[in-house]
Amino acid sequence: MRPFIHDDFLLHTDAARDLYHSFAKAEPIFDYHCHLPQQQILENHQFADLAEIWLGGDHYKWRAMRANGVKERFCTGAATPREKFDAWVGAVPHTLRNPLYHWSHLELARYFGIFDLINQKSADKIWREANEKLATMRVHDILAANKVAVICTTDDPADSLEQHEKIKKLGIKTRVYPTFRPDKALNVGSPAAYNAWLEKLAGAAKTKIASFDDFLSALKKRHDDFHAIGGRLSDHGMENCYAEPCTATEAQAIFDAARAGRAASVADQAKFASFMMLEFGRWDAKKGWTKQLHLGALRNNNTRLLATLGPDTGFDSIGDFPQTRALSRYLDTLDSTDELPRTVLYNLNPADNYAFATMIGNFQDGSVPGKMQFGSGWWFLDQKEAMEWQMNALSNQGLLSRFVGMLTDSRSFLSYTRHEYFRRTLCNLIGAEMERGEIPNDRELVGPMVRRICFANAREYFRLELDPSFRG
């Protein structure tokens, strides 16, 4: 009997199978957005057991466990690694039709050569065999086995870049770059947290922040530092874009008030964010960076568990914020002075798919293929159905052939199977259309496009320095 995970998993036509095995499968991975801990890359971390590498930091799995009636101590609490593993294994059969069922079986198959269905009967065997394999596996082995050419971590301007500097000297083929994510620079509505962050920023920039000009200079210095170490991407996670009129004088007054401990009003927070986002856009454009906008998350919905566990532990959801008008004004303001950088737009609400897919077309300027990108399905949308929605919207309103493809957006080193999952979904979608006669059943036409979406488009678009073996 064929195992659940097999060579042709998710590939339902001959054309899909040919596209995947001949054009997609062997391509390297360009992971241009993730949340991997660079400390574990630096130290070439060896994971103690399957629970650490499989469950640690994975809020997708924690949400499913809670939904299955699992107590918090088995998710993020003090239960033993084996107890946490057993709690997850008990939950997996209940995740049928959830992408976690696919992902979890792919992870065991690809990293550990385990093809058993995950359940309580197979738990002892999985635990034993995976831990035996982990004893011979370190982070660098995982990166090499998956042919990971690039990792772009997510970094605050106040974070030290020391680990990135050390990783650069390791000599591994995977290049690791920081991504400039200045979300906390906008937080003038919470003066205590804001001022504590400003002190950290001042330390990272090796300067004092006594004025608004000092603040801008410190941020600009950190932007320069990220560039010097090879970073070429920025990222912003916001409920929606901001495009309110705001002069430098108004922004300075809002900053000064927050520095003095007075919280900005909601209206002033929007004005300040609007001013700063334009500054960030201009800096990115001047240096030839790519800006990423992650829009639409409603975060930290459970205040009780936020207070107990902190953010990014599985209590966020899709928001229904108005997106298009402010986004249009923001992009247009930068474009009107020829200061719009390459931009990747990600929406979390699938209702915005066609709005975002059409928005990028307004600002393609012919300077580079696919300057404006509609990003791959993000977070709650990085599963088969929603990835198809995103690719269909992009295909119908733009050029799928110029798409920069998949990213992990993950905190787990096992998540490189997400690229395989995406590639299989891509090939199945296109292969079905080839066999229905909706596009030519011509592998010499379609195959190279698939290959480019899997790696080369991202390599050419982001223009990061790669190891010679990945330069093509």
Curated annotation (Swiss-Prot):
A GO molecular-function descriptor: glucuronate isomerase activity
GO process annotations (BP): D-galacturonate catabolic process; D-glucuronate catabolic process
Catalytic activity: D-glucuronate = D-fructuronate; aldehydo-D-galacturonate = keto-D-tagaturonate
Keywords for the protein's UniProt record, in alphabetical order: Isomerase
Domain of life: Bacteria
Pfam families cross-referenced by the UniProt entry: UxaC
InterPro entries for the chain: Metal_Hydrolase, Uronate_isomerase
Pathway(s): Carbohydrate metabolism; pentose and glucuronate interconversion
EC numbers for this chain: 5.3.1.12
Family in the record: Belongs to the metallo-dependent hydrolases superfamily. Uronate isomerase family.
HAMAP family tied to this protein: UxaC
Protein name from the UniProt record: Uronate isomerase
Organism: Opitutus terrae (strain DSM 11246 / JCM 15787 / PB90-1)
Organism phylogeny: Bacteria, Pseudomonadati, Verrucomicrobiota, Opitutia, Opitutales
Gene name as annotated: uxaC
